[in-house]
């Protein structure tokens, strides 16, 4: 075991004592993902599309899910598009899955994958096409029947069907399938799931040969996808524990031996950009194995999957602290996090989503750049001849550039620090203009261009912007240590609820009326904030303050 683990075990002892701990400064780059499961409509869709009304209902369901994810600063959606040799899009290779129309093989009347890509990109999120590789559903199901009719090797185990990984044609087939998605859709990633031998499979070859068979599929997919669009991220979801460690056993359930998934070797060989190990475990079955993944990442991205479903009392007995401790440790290890499944996160089971919103991912984050493929920064954008216009209580910014994406930063100080994630207000923005609320105080804006690989340009920095008309004087509030003093006239007034908002109007914290005239700033990141109060006449801006570290 490397030295990192020795320090890690000492560190985790401290972490274990208290789950409610501050997460420190948020990282600017980090994968924050969810698995959006479509099999049986587990996460989506929740209704069938037979008519135009049914189509709109399905679309509305997805829009609401994505709105919640955007609000929680999730930046990656892993959408299941190959389910059981069936699809969530029109394909010349495989039939429609029945989750969308209710009838296997029948179109729902629109393209769910294309719609999801468009909606994710509108919200600054990546969409990765989740491809279930080996399972083909029931032996007599439409997916397995289609594979057999097309001459593919399908193995029957009981009533279930599986694509045979030991036949070279299987690798070619999956490679062609993924190439079709990469060619026809603006996906940001191809995500391989169940890229392993099934547990029920009687292995008649050596483990070394079995691992070579699975690696052949991975290598083929990587080659085919990168030949079409080299910026598409190829990832997989291996079993959560890679192999036995010197001090900790995997108890027979690991990627390398049980699943014949040499995923760390794929990272080292450079045929995998990201891995999402399914780490649905606790304690010593989680922490040392997470550190092992990071130690053997070879500069690629590791995003442990968290068992959010165990928070549901019908599925497990986990408490919120079981997940929050894991989130905290992953943040310290510079790893991302992914929730399985989406619904357990968006439904805020045991308060997970609200906790993540407030303490973990309060600010947006960019995903890590594909630096092993490109490191050259793109050209910076430039302001238009009239870079800003003030219209009532709105400021419209406009710029010009050649990159597919822009990242927007806002601050009360100049130049805007683009290394500080707290200044990020929009990521993967695709338009050349942005409307900001005019808060009656000068603000500063920075815009960077970003290419397909995630490389950022140098920042285009702005001048300060003055409101269009003089407003009432806003008091500067007293902030001492980690408490904000509420003015006496306010604390004695009819304000029952308070909010802290950032410089662009986003709500950072909400409070009930303080009993002693002070509002706690514990866990509030350092920065500039407005204090708002709610009376019978609505929300009122009560003052401004700057919360900073005191020596």
Residue ranges, per PLM feature:
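Substrate-binding cleft of secreted/luminal carbohydrate-active enzymes
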Residues: 263-264, 268-286, 300-375
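Catalytic domains of carbohydrate-active enzymes, especially glycoside hydrolases
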Residues: 57-86, 184-188
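Beta-strand-rich modules
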Residues: 436-456
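Pro/Thr/Ser/Gly-rich low-complexity, intrinsically disordered linker/stalk tracts
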Residues: 358-402, 454-468
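Aromatic-lined carbohydrate-binding/catalytic grooves of carbohydrate-active enzymes
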Residues: 70-108
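Aromatic-lined carbohydrate-recognition surfaces of secreted/lumenal glycan-active proteins
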Residues: 126-138, 191-192, 210-256, 301-305, ...
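C-terminal tail/sorting-segment detector
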Residues: 468-471, 526-551
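Active-site-adjacent "subsite" loops/lids of carbohydrate-active enzymes
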Residues: 29-31, 37-59, 118, 128-184
